[in-house]
Design a protein with these regions (language model features):
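Glycine-rich FAD pyrophosphate-binding loop
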Residues: 20-40
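Active-site substrate-recognition segment that forms the wall
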Residues: 17-21, 47, 78-79, 176-288
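Helical element adjacent to the flavin cofactor pocket in flavoenzyme catalytic cores
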Residues: 129-167, 171, 175
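C-terminal catalytic lobe of FAD-dependent flavoproteins
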Residues: 264-331
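Dinucleotide-binding Rossmann-like beta1-alpha1 core, especially the glycine-rich loop
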Residues: 44-117
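N-terminal Rossmann-like FAD-binding beta1-loop-alpha1 element of flavoenzymes
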Residues: 2-27
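Short beta-strand to alpha-helix junction loop
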Residues: 55-65, 87-94, 129-145, 241-246
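Short hydrophobic core segments
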Residues: 6, 29, 168-178, 308
């Protein structure tokens, strides 16, 4: 069976690997000249199913728990399993209690344990939540590793060229994200913004989430001395540079986490349009011989492995798990 995958972001690359593992001939097509230059390029890369349950449905936890093992096998050496630390300023202690009430898989940590986990945060926060079973990766390195692995497996890539002849393929798997807004019923775009900061005055070993009733922040360590900041979710499909308000909120929150971030260099800013359905859960939608994998919202790296597996099961006509959003939430 010959499969055409449209879209070379995280959804398309994970689907390509899953289908290749099952012995299918896979071709990946993208109008962009390089892989992963859409929303995937600006992702945080947090493999945090328990934390994400705070604002997501149970399906995100159910589908996301296998992500760490999948990425660890698919991209050896790129997954860091140091957990996630969640903290809040003393004045926002209620936010920490609220977060705890909506999640599981954590243990309460006091000031001493916060200092043990993250020495540079010593004395800054009295209470926190530690989600020991979570991890993170660098999305850009992970996608590059998947690309290399797929090339070695014989996957053909058509990047940046004219439209490909779809008639010669038995199945088409469309992973083009927000490009399907207006075509897939209920799909919308949600703008996400991010910053990269550079400083050697602060060191973090894991993603840290700083809770605030208006400006929640996550900060994810990359290579030494570099940090990715994110968390904006703006209900618009308008692309373009990061807004002044978002940048100020990011920097204020980073400064609240540690004052040394006030002297950091801003080395990159960016925005991505995340595809989302009304319930913010991904779906698998069939139209003739095309299977759409879409709607991962802010959970692309967390949920794409599970969605790829479910889509491959469907293509092979296997029984699909009841956790499959396609069964419960078809478009």
């Amino acid at each position: 069976m010959r499969i055409l995958i449209k879209g070379a972001g995280v959804a398309g690359l994970t689907a390509a690997l899953e289908l290749t593992r099952r012995g299918l001939a896979v071709t990946v097509f993208d109008t962009a000249p390089q892989i992963g230059r859409g929303a995937s390029w600006f992702a945080g890369g947090m493999l945090a199913p328990w934390c994400e349950r705070e604002s997501a449905e149970q399906a995100v936890l159910d589908l996301g728990q296998s992500a760490l093992d999948w990425w660890e096998e698919a991209t050896p050496g790129l997954v860091t399993r140091n957990g996630t630390l969640v903290v809040a300023p003393a004045r926002d202690r209620e936010e920490l209690s609220r977060f705890a009430s909506r999640t599981s898989g954590y243990r309460l940590v006091d000031e001493d344990e916060i200092a043990r986990l993250e020495p540079d945060l010593a004395g800054r926060f009295r209470h926190g939540l530690f989600f020991e079973g979570e991890g993170h990766l660098d999305p850009r390195l992970a996608m590059a590793a998947l690309h290399r692995r797929l090339l070695e497996s014989g996957v053909v890539f058509h990047l940046g060229g004219a439209a490909i002849d779809e008639g010669s393929f038995d199945r088409i798997v469309d992973c083009t994200g927000h490009a399907q807004v207006g075509s897939l019923s209920g799909l919308r775009g949600v703008r996400g913004e991010m910053l990269y900061l550079a400083t050697h005055e602060v060191s973090l070993s894991r993603p840290v989430r700083l809770l605030h009733p208006r400006i929640p922040l996550y900060i994810v360590p990359r290579e030494p001395g570099r940090f990715m900041l994110g968390a904006t979710m703006i209900e618009t499909e308008e692309a373009g540079p990061i807004s002044a308000r978002s940048m100020m909120e990011f920097l204020n929150a980073a400064y609240a986490l540690h004052p040394s971030f006030g002297e950091a260099q801003i080395i990159e800013s960016g925005t991505g349009i995340r595809p989302a359905f009304p319930d913010n859960l991904p779906r698998i939608v069939q139209e003739d011989k095309t299977l759409f994998i879409n709607g991962a919202h802010r959970h692309g790296f967390l949920l794409s492995p599970a969605m790829a597996r479910l889509a491959a099961d469907f293509i092979e006509h296997k029984e699909v798990s009841h956790a499959d959003p396609r069964q419960r939430r078809s478009a």
